[in-house]
Amino acid sequence: MDLDLIQDLPILNFPPAIKIRANTNRDDDGGGCTTPTSSDHKIPPTTATTPPPPPQKPRPPSTPSSLGIRSCKRKLMTSLSKYEIIVNKDEIERFFSSVYNQTMASSTTTAITVAKRRRSFRSCSRR
């Protein structure tokens, strides 16, 4: 049955094939583009096996700071002539000793209250 359908199809008429002649005047010596094969154009085997080094950032020109003198964001005062210190050494010692004494007194007070809280907590848990 399928063969009947194939026989009913019309025959297609194509135009005759165009014949293109091959170029017989072609020179293989250099008339076209070719890859150079001489040893001058080949990559040396040492370069082919090892990758090139990674690119590096160019270094800035040498400055006095890079020669050993490091610059800081904040410049240190070389002389105290800009500011006069009008604080006595005894005042400074009294200030720090008073702060130290206050912290010691407050730490012992908190230690006693913590101990009292623990005692009261333990007595409640025993009942």
Swiss-Prot record:
Residues 21-71 are annotated as: Disordered. Keywords: Cell cycle, Nucleus, Protein kinase inhibitor. Its main location: nucleus. One of its GO terms (cellular component) is nucleus. Induction: Down-regulated by gibberellin. Up-regulated by zeocin treatment. Expressed in the shoot apical meristem, leaf primordia and the elongation zone of the root. Residues 50-63 have a biased composition (Pro residues). GO terms for molecular function: cyclin-dependent protein serine/threonine kinase inhibitor activity. It comes from the Eukaryota. Disruption phenotype: Multicellular trichomes with nuclei showing reduced levels of endoreduplication. InterPro entries: SMR (IPR040389). It is found in: Nucleus. One of its GO terms (biological process) is negative regulation of cyclin-dependent protein serine/threonine kinase activity. Cyclin-dependent protein kinase (CDK) inhibitor that functions as a repressor of mitosis in the endoreduplication cell cycle. Inhibits the kinase activity of CYCD3-1/CDKA-1, CYCD2-1/CDKA-1 and CYCB1-1/CDKB1-1 complexes in a dose dependent manner. Cooperates with SMR1 and SMR2 to promote endoreplication during leaf development. Required for normal trichome endoreplicating cell cycles. Positive regulator of effector-triggered immunity (ETI). Interacts with CDKA-1. Interacts with CYCD2-1, CYCD3-2 and CYCD4-1. Interacts with CDKB1-1. Interacts with CPR5. Plants over-expressing SIM are dwarf with serrated leaves containing enlarged cells with increased levels of nuclear DNA. This is Cyclin-dependent protein kinase inhibitor SIM. It comes from Arabidopsis thaliana (Mouse-ear cress). The lineage of its organism: Eukaryota, Viridiplantae, Streptophyta, Embryophyta, Tracheophyta.
